[in-house]
Amino acid sequence: MIDIQRLYSLFKECSSVTTDSRAIAGGEMFFGLKGENFDGNEYALKALELGAKYAVVNEDSVAASSGDERVISVPDTLEALQALARHHRENTFVDGRRLTVIGLTGTNGKTTTKELITRVLSVRYNVTATKGNLNNDIGVPLSLLSINDATQLAVIEMGANHPDDIAKLVKVSEPDYGLITNVGRAHLLGFGSFEGVKRAKGQLYDYLAAHSGTAFVNTDDPDLTAMAADRWSFTVPAIPAVPLVPEPVEGVEGPVIRYGLSLFKAKVLPSSSEHPYLRMKMPGGLLVETHLAGAYNATNVVAAIAVGLHFGVSLEEAIDAVSTYIPKNNRSQMEKTERNVLIQDAYNANPSSMAAALDNLVLVKAERKGALLGDMRELGEESQTEHLKVLNQVLSMGLDLVCLVGEEFAKALAVRHSDSVKWFASSEDLTAWLKANPVSGMTILVKGSRGIQMEKTLPEL
């Protein structure tokens, strides 16, 4: 049994919380987490030597019997970390005020949308947000535990690979508001089917509906609209009546705030060599300029604007904030090298994000185009079908260069062979080929699942 009051009082003495003994700077509360291939309990005493104030360990670990008063024994360190985070989320302010938390999930665009929302809300508020994509059962509690007395709003990203992941994370984060960016065919190995994806992501809506929370819903998306309608009573008007203000619609148990390109009457402008990034025109002649590659990011931008408007950020302020966001970590980045223009989206890939990236490549104005694509992982029995769909799409585009990497694309090529496609077993093999066969004067999409590491090819482009 975890004595959460005692644990919380000790946490309040610490500078921060960490699960990485290598990150100890002094004064932290260290949690020794145990996974399939590691055991952080083994580093607990070392963490104390390095300056951690306390170390939380499993009660059956060697460190638990060390006799060091700074060692706190619990039945399960991960459960303790999550319980501490939930308690901190509920007791952030000594005067009893409740911190407003915005929860975010979705198949694609979670991290980009989270960063855009944070940038927009920071115009008016002190915002604590998930760092990077620390959105799992460890990252979410660590994000919550970084909240301090100065925090006015928290934006928490939640990821999922398995059916009940979101249900567990909302119990820790207890969001007051929620937004699902989209639902797509990803992690099918864990979810079983697209319906499984919708059920899993919809657990955010389930929590909000059960706790009188508020959902931001992109009503341009039929899947999200249907998922919201299953939980709240609201209708989508055929003709949007309010072009620039998200319209709250009282549901059975909580409000729904609608947004979308059509509701905002936002128009995505064509890209060009002079304007390669996403741009949108809003009513009244307002221009939204971004540093994001890909028209598919338009819904992420509109989501951030909608959230900002609801929390009192003006439209002009929101547009300015969006324009300052520069993506990183190979997410929707566009870079001009000495030889090529690169659309770097190599952080991850699934069927829906791959199709969207290829659709965007069609819209890009360029004389010569290419695509370097890596396998999409965790698709289970649907893998060959989904890779064949991507292969068919890319072959229909008439690209000047198509390079595919991985065993799943090899299986697709066995079904539909093409002499115009170059296949490689690994990103290292493709990198070696690019070094021996330099490519220049081309706009190139680089995308694949994280494990394929397509970013290794970038230095040769």
Residue ranges, per PLM feature:
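Active-site beta-alpha connecting loops in nucleotide-dependent enzymes
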Residues: 33-38, 327-330, 346-419
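Generic hydrophobic/aromatic pocket-lining and core-packing "Φ" positions
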Residues: 44, 166, 201, 205, ...
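ATP-dependent carboxylate/acyl-activation modules
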Residues: 104, 110, 329-332, 451, ...
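Short, basic phosphate-binding NTP loop
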Residues: 2-103, 112-123, 145, 414, ...
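Acidic, Mg2+-coordinating active-site environments of NTP-dependent enzymes
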Residues: 61-67, 97, 179-341, 366-367, ...
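Residue-level signal for inorganic ion chemistry
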Residues: 28, 47, 84, 104, ...
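Phosphate-binding loop of NTP-binding sites
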Residues: 79-219, 223-232, 242-252, 308, ...
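Non-catalytic positions within long, well-ordered alpha-helices that form the structural scaffold/packing
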Residues: 44, 48-49, 170-171, 362, ...
